[in-house]
């Protein structure tokens, strides 16, 4: 009877709390306290029993480069096995062994978290219940029990001697650093610069590596202090010119993810703790993105994007709620007039979020018609740049895929350009670089057939074929739209107050619904094949940066979103007449904003300018120097911002040339005038240099049906000049300056393979850059350059922190690079 009574009880849940997890139903069957106490008598802690019997402990301990896997304790029988991040996965195999009763509950001996294999989720516990009492008992036994000297074998003695030698070396290095710090005290830092280790919560090395670099970003810590200030008042200029007084709004406290981030950065600056456990911050990230739950191997760049997007979304929500309170209406039901007013004020936000102020930059895509030489610009923001990494094998194959139908004169003129073009376009398209020639030819034929069908359909229905060549950017950075993709492939835009101004690269498009962890279907339109494919995000493992080739939805100029027909074409006939490459326009600049009152604001701004064609594609410095060295980060930036030719199926629909052919502008009646497609020139350059530049090297690629990692070493400098990749009118750059310098302060390195790898971080402990802080906080642009701040590099692998020379950092296999602006 007692069991029935306890079985029927339910745990009271507070609706206001977000931290409570669902109660595991397998605790009673997976927990055996009597067997556990017997098994923990005279046991060696934190050692996998199966690896020890296989004589693999000694071999793994001798390798300094390989990290020791986490050990999990079975709460049913006391078996100790290595976790999922190890090669053997003995703890998982122990659970999968058929038995009469399940051995599904395991306890991590590193961070004392409980995991249920049946639920495939973490089990929450407290000290009052049975599970919490068992965990407390195991922790006491682990702290009390110590191995006796007589029981130690020769192998363990050798291991302890090696550990003592390492500890003595570390102490000597620390003494040297302390002496150097005494001789050269920091000038601008009132507090001591510290680098601490981070506890691995279970395959969270991808998270720890990114957090180490963010903790060495002083500007982020300063802005978070400003955001946390209570009673912050923000003034927003009125959207209507008739209203002269700005709207004053009182901001609420920041969201839980932002508060957890601020708490984590403050904890990293404390000098008392040697190792920090970022459990609260990681749990908040998992609430924004459910894919990070489960302690699986994940991707660092994906984690960084979700983290920044989550904090930015919370900041936009603060502003939206403040605007509603300023109008005296905080209810969810609003009339249409008030809704429009709120959205107008949201668009007029004078101060961007702290994420955009630190990591935000701007890209400008320029397209020029070869006949009328009219220039059109597309501006969009970004948080990081995903750069292509070309493998030697893919580069050789792509060179052989040149079009053999070209004349000899064209080959002589464009041979070098076509080699780069083919290799780069192939890397961006959905045709894998490692596929056979037969599949590649078949894909090209299919693309040509679809292009012909689209041309025929366009003549019949008066549709336009290549708006994507004008209105979207073919590079791996695309504006992030808060879009909800339905299973039928239709694009439904959520009416939300959150302004998504970030950029997601085309291979991996994340929207706000991803942050809520809801699986969905995404319909993608690739650039080369113009075909549609549906990708089930729920069934795809995104570990280790497996990229999904998707593109963000495209809007036309009237605010209507472009939907796909049954034949895969894009219906953009309505509203295209508003976008014209009209060289006869008198104003120098016309902004064509793709905003609609009923939708969330986007970040792309289209404009047609009367700009000199000779200087439109010029950069602040010479860029041709970096076209030779293919193994450098400068060459990756060169490929990312390279000049492209829009020809053949990618021709530009030029309204100026169309009007000239029709002898002047006339009313566009269907079937009366013929559209003119011309060759065009296209290039993407940086038009706003971010204070903190984040570069992502796309090392993980798909070759046929297999996944591979490009282990090629990419050289990256300690001082990077971004001027060869910036426009002449680059913002945040003084008029006479021809250099845009950045200093390296953080690296995320991935070692291993696609299936089993490890992330580590290189971070530079240094003094804060005062000029950079003034730029971010106050917008001051100094005329002269500040010297690079000196500091000490550290290599951090979870809890292990070691000082390293600069040469070791520059020789690492970088996956993410963090640069700060030198001003």
UniProtKB/Swiss-Prot annotation:
The primary gene name is USP16
Q: What is known of its domains?
A: The UBP-type zinc finger binds 3 zinc ions that form a pair of cross-braced ring fingers encapsulated within a third zinc finger in the primary structure. It recognizes the C-terminal tail of free ubiquitin.
Known InterPro entries for this protein? Papain-like_cys_pep_sf, Peptidase_C19, Peptidase_C19_UCH, UBP16, USP_CS, USP_dom, Znf_RING/FYVE/PHD, Znf_UBP
Q: Where in the cell is it found?
A: Nucleus; Cytoplasm
Membrane-spanning ranges = none
Region spans: Disordered: 146-189, 394-460
| UniProt-recorded name of the protein | Ubiquitin carboxyl-terminal hydrolase 16
> For this protein, what is the EC number?
3.4.19.12
Gene3D superfamilies under this entry?
Answer: Cysteine proteinases (3.90.70.10), Zinc/RING finger domain, C3HC4 (zinc finger) (3.30.40.10)
USP domain boundaries: 196-822
Q: What family does this chain come from, according to its entry? A: Belongs to the peptidase C19 family. USP16 subfamily.
Biased composition regions of type Basic and acidic residues, renumbered to the chain: 149-181, 394-408, 421-430
Q: In which tissues is it expressed?
A: Present in all the tissues examined including fetal brain, lung, liver, kidney, and adult heart, brain, placenta, lung, liver, skeletal muscle, kidney and pancreas.
Q: In which residue ranges is the amino acid composition biased (Basic residues)?
A: 438-458
- What does the further note read? USP16 may contribute to somatic stem cell defects observed in Down syndrome. USP16 is triplicated in Down syndrome and its overexpression may contribute to proliferation defects in stem cells. Reduction of USP16 levels results in increased proliferation capacity of Down syndrome fibroblasts.
Q: What class of enzyme is it?
A: hydrolase
The job of this chain, per UniProt, is described as:
Specifically deubiquitinates 'Lys-120' of histone H2A (H2AK119Ub), a specific tag for epigenetic transcriptional repression, thereby acting as a coactivator. Deubiquitination of histone H2A is a prerequisite for subsequent phosphorylation at 'Ser-11' of histone H3 (H3S10ph), and is required for chromosome segregation when cells enter into mitosis. In resting B- and T-lymphocytes, phosphorylation by AURKB leads to enhance its activity, thereby maintaining transcription in resting lymphocytes. Regulates Hox gene expression via histone H2A deubiquitination. Prefers nucleosomal substrates.
Quaternary arrangement and interactors, per the entry? Answer: Homotetramer. Associates with late pre-40S ribosomes. Interacts with CEP78; promoting deubiquitination of tektins.
Q: Which reaction does it catalyse?
A: Thiol-dependent hydrolysis of ester, thioester, amide, peptide and isopeptide bonds formed by the C-terminal Gly of ubiquitin (a 76-residue protein attached to proteins as an intracellular targeting signal)
Looking up PROSITE patterns in the UniProt record yields:
USP_1 (PS00972), USP_2 (PS00973), USP_3 (PS50235), ZF_UBP (PS50271)
User: What keywords appear on the UniProt entry?
Assistant: Activator, Cell cycle, Cell division, Chromatin regulator, Chromosomal rearrangement, Cytoplasm, Hydrolase, Isopeptide bond, Metal-binding, Mitosis, Nucleus, Phosphoprotein, Protease, Thiol protease, Transcription, Transcription regulation, Ubl conjugation, Ubl conjugation pathway, Zinc, Zinc-finger
Give residues where Phosphothreonine occurs: 554
> Which species expresses this protein natively?
Homo sapiens
């Amino acid at each position: 009877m007692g069991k029935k009574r306890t079985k029927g009880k339910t745990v009271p849940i507070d609706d206001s709390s977000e931290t409570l997890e669902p109660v595991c139903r397998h605790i009673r069957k997976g927990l055996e306290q009597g067997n556990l106490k017997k098994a923990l008598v005279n046991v060696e802690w934190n050692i996998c029993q199966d690896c020890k019997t296989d004589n693999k402990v000694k071999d793994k301990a001798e390798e300094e480069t390989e990290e020791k896997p986490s050990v999990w304790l079975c709460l049913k029988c006391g078996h100790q096995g290595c976790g999922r991040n190890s090669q053997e996965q003995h703890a998982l195999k122990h659970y999968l062994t058929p038995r009469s009763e399940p051995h599904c509950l395991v306890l991590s001996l590193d961070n004392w978290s409980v995991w249920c294999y049946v639920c495939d989720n973490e089990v929450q516990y407290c000290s009052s219940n049975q599970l919490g009492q068992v965990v407390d008992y195991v922790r006491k036994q682990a702290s009390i029990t110590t191995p006796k000297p007589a029981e130690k074998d020769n192998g363990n003695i050798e291991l302890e001697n090696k550990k003592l030698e390492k500890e003595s070396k570390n102490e000597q290095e620390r003494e040297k650093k302390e002496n150097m710090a005494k001789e050269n005290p920091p000038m601008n830092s009132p507090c001591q610069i510290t680098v601490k280790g981070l506890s691995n919560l279970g395959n969270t090395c991808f998270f720890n590596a990114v957090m180490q670099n963010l903790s060495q970003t002083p500007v982020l810590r300063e802005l978070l202090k400003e955001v946390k200030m209570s009673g912050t008042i923000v003034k927003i200029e009125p959207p209507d010119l008739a209203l002269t007084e700005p709207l004053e709004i009182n901001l609420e406290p920041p969201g839980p993810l932002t508060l957890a981030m601020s708490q984590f950065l403050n904890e990293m600056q404390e000098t008392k703790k040697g190792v920090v456990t970022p459990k609260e911050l990681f749990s908040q990230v998992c609430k924004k993105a459910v894919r990070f739950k489960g302690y699986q191997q994940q991707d660092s760049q994906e984690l960084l994007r979700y983290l920044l997007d989550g904090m930015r979304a919370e900041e936009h929500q603060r502003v939206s709620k403040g605007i509603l309170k300023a109008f005296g209406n905080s209810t969810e039901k609003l009339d249409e007039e008030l809704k429009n007013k709120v959205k107008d004020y949201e668009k007029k936000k004078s101060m961007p979020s702290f994420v955009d102020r630190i990591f935000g930059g701007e890209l400008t895509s320029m397209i020029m018609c070869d006949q009328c030489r009219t220039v059109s610009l597309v501006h969009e923001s970004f948080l990081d740049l995903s750069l292509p990494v070309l493998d030697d094998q893919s580069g050789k194959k792509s060179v052989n895929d040149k079009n053999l139908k070209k004349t000899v004169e064209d080959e002589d003129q464009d041979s070098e350009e076509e080699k780069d073009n083919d290799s780069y376009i192939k890397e961006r398209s959905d045709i894998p670089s490692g596929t056979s020639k037969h599949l590649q030819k078949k894909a090209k034929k299919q693309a040509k057939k679809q292009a012909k069908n689209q041309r025929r359909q366009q003549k019949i229905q008066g549709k336009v074929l290549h708006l994507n060549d004008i209105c979207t950017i073919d590079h791996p950075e695309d504006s992030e739209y808060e879009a909800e993709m339905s299973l039928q492939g239709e694009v439904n835009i959520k009416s939300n107050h959150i302004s998504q101004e970030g950029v997601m690269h085309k291979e991996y498009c994340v929207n706000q619904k991803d942050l809520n962890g809801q699986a969905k279907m995404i319909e993608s339109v690739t650039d080369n094949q113009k075909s549609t494919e549906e990708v089930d995000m729920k069934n795809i493992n995104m570990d280790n940066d497996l990229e999904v080739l998707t593109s963000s939805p495209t809007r036309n100029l009237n605010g209507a979103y472009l939907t796909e027909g049954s034949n895969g074409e894009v219906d953009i006939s309505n509203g295209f007449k508003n976008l014209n490459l009209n060289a006869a326009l008198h104003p120098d600049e016309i902004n064509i904003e793709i905003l609609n009152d009923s939708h969330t604001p986007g970040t792309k701004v289209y404009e047609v300018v009367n700009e000199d064609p000779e200087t439109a594609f010029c950069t602040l410095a010479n860029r041709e120097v970096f076209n030779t060295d293919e193994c450098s980060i400068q060459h990756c930036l060169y490929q990312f911002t390279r000049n492209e030719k829009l020809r053949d199926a990618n021709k530009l629909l030029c309204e100026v040339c169309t009007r000239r052919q029709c002898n002047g502008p006339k009313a566009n009646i269907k079937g009366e005038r013929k559209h003119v497609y011309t060759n065009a020139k296209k290039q993407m350059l940086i038009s706003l240099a971010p204070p903190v530049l984040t570069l992502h090297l796309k090392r993980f690629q798909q070759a046929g049906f297999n996944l591979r990692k490009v282990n090629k070493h990419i050289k990256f400098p300690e001082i990077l000049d971004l001027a060869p990749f910036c426009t002449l009118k680059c913002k945040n750059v003084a008029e006479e300056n021809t250099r845009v310098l950045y200093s390296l302060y953080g690296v995320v390195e991935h070692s291993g393979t696609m299936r089993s790898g490890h992330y580590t971080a290189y971070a530079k402990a240094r003094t804060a850059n005062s000029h950079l802080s003034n730029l971010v906080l106050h917008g001051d642009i100094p005329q002269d350059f500040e010297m690079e701040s000196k500091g000490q590099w550290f290599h951090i692998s979870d809890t292990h922190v070691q000082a390293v020379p600069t040469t070791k950092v520059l020789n690492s296999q970088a996956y993410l690079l963090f640069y700060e602006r030198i001003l």
